[in-house]
Amino acid sequence: MLSRRALMMAGGSLALGAGSARATAIMTEDGFYREDWFLDSFLELAEDRKSVAAAGKQLAVIWEQPGCPYCRETHLVNFAQKVAETYIRDHFEVLQLNLRGSRIVTDFDGERLGENQLAHKYGVRGTPIIQFFSDKDDLAQKAPLEREVSRIPGYMPPRAFLLMFAFVAERAYERGSLRDYLRRQG
């Protein structure tokens, strides 16, 4: 759990830029920033979710596209903060997908789609978007948007970004709304 004290210290560190000197984001041949700790996957979401859950973590999917300035900001500012990186790595596996990509992904329900078709199926239209999926085994039976427990719908400043990950990691969505959670965090 991200304690109030840890959160305040993290917020101060983020505001001062502490930890921003480390950089694990690399620019790939296809124009993406990628963290060296992102999930390497065969793009089979049900299998990824199972292995992630077995490790005691949750699956997050980040949708990006080449040239996206807010995707760049997410990597070079948010993921670059040591406190955020550590928290996310401890609680999540992050799979990076291309909004306009053509790699074949097997969805939770077994449907095989190109990345761009999968994005459309989940209502992903812009970038960056981070989807957080339930760690329950019943995802194949649910409608696509009901599989998510939360979503970051675009760029968020570092403190709010970290709080979204904490909201999901603590399963606070089971006890109330994000708004209530944020109010309690101060």
Question: Predicted segment positions?
Answer:
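Structural micro-motif
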Residues: 115-131
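Short active-site neighborhood of thiol/selenol oxidoreductases, capturing the structured segment around
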Residues: 55-68
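Typically the conserved alpha-helix immediately C-terminal to a functionally engaged Cys/Sec
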Residues: 72-87
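N-proximal helix/coil linker or "cap" segments that precede and/or mark the start of modular domains
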Residues: 24-37
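Thiol-based oxidoreductase modules, predominantly thioredoxin-like and allied folds used
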Residues: 88-113
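Non-catalytic, surface beta->alpha helical segment in thiol-disulfide oxidoreductase systems
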Residues: 134-173
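N-terminal secretory signal peptides and thylakoid transit peptides that target proteins
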Residues: 1-14
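A short beta-strand-turn-helix
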Residues: 41-58
